[in-house]
Amino acid sequence: GLVEAHRASGAACTLLAGTSDVALPYGRVLRRPDGSFDRVVEERDCTDEQRAIRELNVGIYCFESRLLVPALGRLTCDNAQHEYYLTDVPAILRDDFGGKIEIYTADLGEQIIGVNTPEQLELTERYLRERGE
């Protein structure tokens, strides 16, 4: 799984990503031309072109703990929501600390559901009722 892949890779960060044919309110994983990690762009900050990307950041990470706190200290709130995004940490680890960033891709299915709005909460509750949970 994710933790085992992270440990084996020696990466500064391994992030969980998944694909979906449905437009979900998750950040998009952007890759460089060679397929390596570029950055995560939060859904609200995406361009229309980025919003069409179906590789999604699930928001679950493994970090090299000794690098995490210094990287958090370099976060800024220069984005549409004026928030500090944990999603910026992988790029900071790569760019400022020379850390390797890995992407662990998994089938999302309906196993991971984000709830950021009342509408998403309603959809999640309906899904769980239909499953009998």
Model-derived features: where do they sit?
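Catalytic-core segments of class I nucleotidyltransferases/pyrophosphorylases
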Residues: 38-110, 119-132
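Conserved beta-loop-beta/alpha segment of the NTase-like Rossmann-fold superfamily
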Residues: 1-34, 58, 62-65, 70-75
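Short, intrinsically disordered, charge-balanced linker/junction segments flanking boundaries
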Residues: 1-4, 129-133
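Conserved acidic, metal-coordinating active-site core of Asp-based
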Residues: 113
